[in-house]
A protein has these predicted regions:
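N-terminal pre-catalytic "stem/leader" segment of glycosyltransferase-like enzymes
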Residues: 1-53
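Short loop/turn segments at strand-loop or loop-helix junctions that form parts
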Residues: 5-10, 78-80, 128
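A generic structural signal for short, well-ordered alpha-helical segments in conserved domains
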Residues: 30, 111-115, 123
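Short, well-ordered alpha-helix to beta-strand connector turns
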Residues: 37, 52-55, 71-72, 99-102, ...
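Short loop/helix-cap segments at secondary-structure boundaries that form the rim of catalytic
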Residues: 47-53, 64-71, 114-118
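Active-site proximal beta-strand in glycosyltransferases
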Residues: 56-85, 103-104
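A conserved, positively charged/aromatic
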Residues: 75-76, 87-101
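Carbohydrate-associated surface elements
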Residues: 109, 129
Length: 131
């Protein structure tokens, strides 16, 4: 299974000791999945990534990647509250509305407080798994 973990960050993903919370969660998920699947952990959309037909794309807090890449499943991993104004300002609203996205929230609070206007295909809660 081909899985892309995409995180929009300025951090250097090669050095896990200098990563922030969201990046660490993605890095740990990458390490967990890489033994069983073909997994790529990236912060940029390269031409090489565009040429691949992904089975799953998991993007943290950034739905715009779903417009650029092909995937059978599109999962938006929401770590923060996504208000409609913020989605407009960050140019994510159309990506959310026009892609068949599954939303994964890190808490029941986020799931409950994310607008139903975002017509997510599926809504699930998976708590953060940091120790």
């Amino acid at each position: 299974m081909k899985i892309l973990l995409f995180v929009s960050t300025k951090q250097r993903l090669e050095n896990p000791y200098n990563l922030g919370g969201i990046e660490i969660l993605n890095y740990e998920l990458f390490n967990y999945l890489k033994n069983k699947h073909e997994v790529v952990f990236s912060k940029k959309v390269s031409q090489k990534l565009v040429s691949i037909n992904w089975d799953i794309i998991i993007s943290s807090n950034d739905a715009r990647v779903f417009n650029k890449l092909k995937s059978k499943r599109k999962i938006l991993w929401l770590h923060n509250k996504l208000q409609i104004e913020k989605a407009l300002r960050k140019k994510q609203l159309l990506s959310i509305l026009f892609n068949k996205i599954e939303a994964v929230f890190v808490s029941d609070y986020l799931k409950k407080n994310t607008s139903i206007f975002y017509n997510f295909f599926k809504r699930e809660v998976i708590p953060n798994f940091l120790p």
